[in-house]
Protein backbone atom coordinates (compact mmCIF):
# COMPACT_ATOMS: atom_id res chain seq x y z
CA UNK A 1 0.00 0.00 0.00
CA UNK A 2 1.48 3.33 -1.06
CA UNK A 3 1.53 6.04 1.61
CA UNK A 4 0.61 8.85 -0.78
CA UNK A 5 0.73 12.32 0.75
CA UNK A 6 1.67 15.80 -0.44
CA UNK A 7 4.60 16.08 2.00
CA UNK A 8 6.96 13.85 3.99
CA UNK A 9 9.11 14.35 7.09
CA UNK A 10 12.69 13.22 7.65
CA UNK A 11 11.34 10.24 9.60
CA UNK A 12 9.18 9.29 6.61
CA UNK A 13 12.18 9.51 4.27
CA UNK A 14 14.25 7.33 6.61
CA UNK A 15 11.35 4.82 6.65
CA UNK A 16 11.48 4.84 2.84
CA UNK A 17 15.10 3.71 3.05
CA UNK A 18 13.87 0.67 5.00
CA UNK A 19 11.16 0.00 2.35
CA UNK A 20 8.44 0.90 4.87
CA UNK A 21 6.85 3.85 3.06
CA UNK A 22 5.85 2.49 -0.35
CA UNK A 23 5.72 -1.19 0.60
CA UNK A 24 8.23 -3.97 0.10
CA UNK A 25 8.16 -3.60 -3.70
CA UNK A 26 8.51 0.16 -3.79
CA UNK A 27 11.83 1.87 -4.49
CA UNK A 28 13.69 2.79 -1.29
CA UNK A 29 15.58 6.03 -0.84
CA UNK A 30 19.24 5.83 0.18
CA UNK A 31 19.88 5.79 3.91
CA UNK A 32 22.37 7.47 6.20
CA UNK A 33 24.61 10.14 4.75
CA UNK A 34 23.48 9.50 1.18
CA UNK A 35 19.91 10.63 1.90
CA UNK A 36 20.24 14.15 0.52
CA UNK A 37 17.02 15.71 1.83
CA UNK A 38 15.40 16.41 5.19
CA UNK A 39 11.82 16.71 3.98
CA UNK A 40 9.60 16.69 0.92
CA UNK A 41 7.42 19.79 1.07
CA UNK A 42 5.28 19.26 -2.04
CA UNK A 43 4.35 16.41 -4.38
CA UNK A 44 1.69 16.64 -7.07
CA UNK A 45 0.71 14.52 -10.07
CA UNK A 46 0.19 17.69 -12.07
CA UNK A 47 1.89 21.05 -11.81
CA UNK A 48 5.48 21.87 -12.55
CA UNK A 49 6.68 23.41 -15.81
CA UNK A 50 5.11 20.65 -17.90
CA UNK A 51 1.98 20.01 -15.79
CA UNK A 52 2.99 16.33 -15.48
CA UNK A 53 4.13 16.26 -11.87
CA UNK A 54 6.19 18.26 -9.42
CA UNK A 55 8.31 17.56 -6.34
CA UNK A 56 9.95 20.05 -4.00
CA UNK A 57 12.25 18.97 -1.17
CA UNK A 58 14.69 20.62 1.23
CA UNK A 59 17.99 19.93 2.98
CA UNK A 60 18.99 21.97 6.03
CA UNK A 61 22.61 23.07 5.83
CA UNK A 62 24.96 23.31 8.79
CA UNK A 63 28.77 23.28 8.98
CA UNK A 64 28.77 19.80 10.60
CA UNK A 65 27.44 17.98 7.53
CA UNK A 66 29.78 15.10 6.64
CA UNK A 67 30.97 16.36 3.26
CA UNK A 68 32.22 19.75 4.49
CA UNK A 69 35.05 18.13 6.50
CA UNK A 70 36.47 16.28 3.50
CA UNK A 71 35.49 18.31 0.42
CA UNK A 72 37.76 20.26 0.71
CA UNK A 73 40.01 20.82 3.74
CA UNK A 74 40.25 24.58 4.12
CA UNK A 75 37.71 25.15 1.31
CA UNK A 76 34.49 23.36 2.37
CA UNK A 77 31.83 23.00 -0.32
CA UNK A 78 29.06 20.47 -0.94
CA UNK A 79 30.04 18.28 -3.90
CA UNK A 80 27.91 19.13 -6.93
CA UNK A 81 27.37 15.43 -7.61
CA UNK A 82 25.42 15.17 -4.34
CA UNK A 83 22.94 17.77 -5.58
CA UNK A 84 22.61 15.84 -8.82
CA UNK A 85 22.11 12.60 -6.90
CA UNK A 86 19.43 14.27 -4.77
CA UNK A 87 17.50 15.11 -7.92
CA UNK A 88 17.75 11.49 -9.10
CA UNK A 89 16.63 10.35 -5.63
CA UNK A 90 13.53 12.53 -5.92
CA UNK A 91 12.66 11.23 -9.39
CA UNK A 92 12.77 7.67 -8.00
CA UNK A 93 10.81 8.69 -4.90
CA UNK A 94 8.09 10.15 -7.12
CA UNK A 95 7.88 6.92 -9.12
CA UNK A 96 7.35 5.02 -5.86
CA UNK A 97 4.76 7.59 -4.79
CA UNK A 98 2.87 6.83 -8.02
CA UNK A 99 2.89 3.12 -7.11
CA UNK A 100 5.88 2.01 -9.19
CA UNK A 101 7.79 -1.03 -7.95
CA UNK A 102 11.42 -2.02 -8.19
CA UNK A 103 14.84 -0.72 -7.29
CA UNK A 104 15.63 2.75 -8.53
CA UNK A 105 18.60 3.34 -10.79
CA UNK A 106 19.78 6.61 -12.31
CA UNK A 107 19.84 6.17 -16.08
CA UNK A 108 21.30 9.47 -17.15
CA UNK A 109 20.91 13.18 -17.52
CA UNK A 110 20.82 15.34 -20.62
CA UNK A 111 22.72 18.34 -19.32
CA UNK A 112 23.85 19.69 -15.94
CA UNK A 113 24.92 23.27 -15.28
CA UNK A 114 26.52 24.56 -12.10
CA UNK A 115 26.36 28.31 -11.46
CA UNK A 116 26.88 28.45 -7.70
CA UNK A 117 27.90 26.43 -4.68
CA UNK A 118 26.65 25.23 -1.30
CA UNK A 119 28.89 26.52 1.47
CA UNK A 120 28.66 25.78 5.21
CA UNK A 121 27.29 29.30 5.73
CA UNK A 122 24.14 28.49 3.73
CA UNK A 123 20.89 27.76 5.53
CA UNK A 124 18.84 25.64 3.14
CA UNK A 125 19.09 23.77 -0.15
CA UNK A 126 15.87 23.29 -2.10
CA UNK A 127 15.29 20.84 -4.92
CA UNK A 128 12.56 21.31 -7.54
CA UNK A 129 11.72 18.52 -9.95
CA UNK A 130 9.47 19.14 -12.97
CA UNK A 131 8.28 15.93 -14.62
CA UNK A 132 8.20 15.73 -18.39
CA UNK A 133 7.17 12.10 -18.75
CA UNK A 134 6.42 9.00 -16.70
CA UNK A 135 6.41 5.61 -18.40
CA UNK A 136 4.56 2.94 -16.44
CA UNK A 137 4.65 -0.27 -18.45
CA UNK A 138 7.08 -3.17 -18.20
CA UNK A 139 9.66 -0.42 -17.78
CA UNK A 140 8.87 2.19 -15.14
CA UNK A 141 10.82 5.36 -15.85
CA UNK A 142 10.61 9.05 -15.03
CA UNK A 143 12.07 11.89 -17.08
CA UNK A 144 12.29 15.30 -15.46
CA UNK A 145 14.09 18.62 -15.31
CA UNK A 146 15.44 19.78 -11.98
CA UNK A 147 16.82 22.75 -10.12
CA UNK A 148 18.92 23.05 -6.98
CA UNK A 149 18.59 26.28 -5.04
CA UNK A 150 20.63 27.56 -2.11
CA UNK A 151 18.82 30.05 0.11
CA UNK A 152 16.37 30.74 -2.73
CA UNK A 153 18.89 31.20 -5.57
CA UNK A 154 19.12 28.65 -8.41
CA UNK A 155 22.67 27.25 -8.50
CA UNK A 156 22.33 23.99 -10.51
CA UNK A 157 20.01 22.99 -13.31
CA UNK A 158 19.60 19.58 -14.90
CA UNK A 159 17.60 18.59 -17.96
CA UNK A 160 16.26 15.16 -18.79
CA UNK A 161 17.04 13.44 -15.49
CA UNK A 162 16.18 9.77 -16.03
CA UNK A 163 15.47 7.15 -13.38
CA UNK A 164 14.16 3.64 -13.94
CA UNK A 165 12.71 1.06 -11.56
CA UNK A 166 13.98 -2.49 -11.96
CA UNK A 167 12.59 -5.62 -10.32
CA UNK A 168 15.82 -7.47 -11.16
CA UNK A 169 19.09 -5.54 -11.17
CA UNK A 170 21.37 -8.54 -11.76
CA UNK A 171 21.76 -7.77 -15.46
CA UNK A 172 21.82 -4.00 -15.02
Curated annotation (Swiss-Prot):
It is found in: Cytoplasm. Its EC number is 4.2.1.59, 5.3.3.14. The active site is at 71. The keyword Calcium does not apply. It catalyses: a (3R)-hydroxyacyl-[ACP] = a (2E)-enoyl-[ACP] + H2O; (3R)-hydroxydecanoyl-[ACP] = (2E)-decenoyl-[ACP] + H2O; (2E)-decenoyl-[ACP] = (3Z)-decenoyl-[ACP]. Pathway: Lipid metabolism; fatty acid biosynthesis. Pfam families: FabA. The keyword Amino-acid biosynthesis does not apply. GO terms for molecular function: (3R)-hydroxyacyl-[acyl-carrier-protein] dehydratase activity; trans-2-decenoyl-acyl-carrier-protein isomerase activity. It comes from the Bacteria. GO terms for cellular component: cytoplasm. Coiled coil: none annotated. GO terms for biological process: unsaturated fatty acid biosynthetic process. Belongs to the thioester dehydratase family. FabA subfamily. Necessary for the introduction of cis unsaturation into fatty acids. Catalyzes the dehydration of (3R)-3-hydroxydecanoyl-ACP to E-(2)-decenoyl-ACP and then its isomerization to Z-(3)-decenoyl-ACP. Can catalyze the dehydratase reaction for beta-hydroxyacyl-ACPs with saturated chain lengths up to 16:0, being most active on intermediate chain length. Homodimer. This is 3-hydroxydecanoyl-[acyl-carrier-protein] dehydratase. It comes from Erwinia tasmaniensis (strain DSM 17950 / CFBP 7177 / CIP 109463 / NCPPB 4357 / Et1/99). The lineage of its organism: Bacteria, Pseudomonadati, Pseudomonadota, Gammaproteobacteria, Enterobacterales.
Amino acid sequence: MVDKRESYTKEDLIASGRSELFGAGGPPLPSGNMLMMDRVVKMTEDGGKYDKGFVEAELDINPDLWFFSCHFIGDPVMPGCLGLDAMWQLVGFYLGWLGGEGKGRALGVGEVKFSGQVLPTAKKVSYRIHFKRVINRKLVMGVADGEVLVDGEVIYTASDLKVGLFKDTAAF
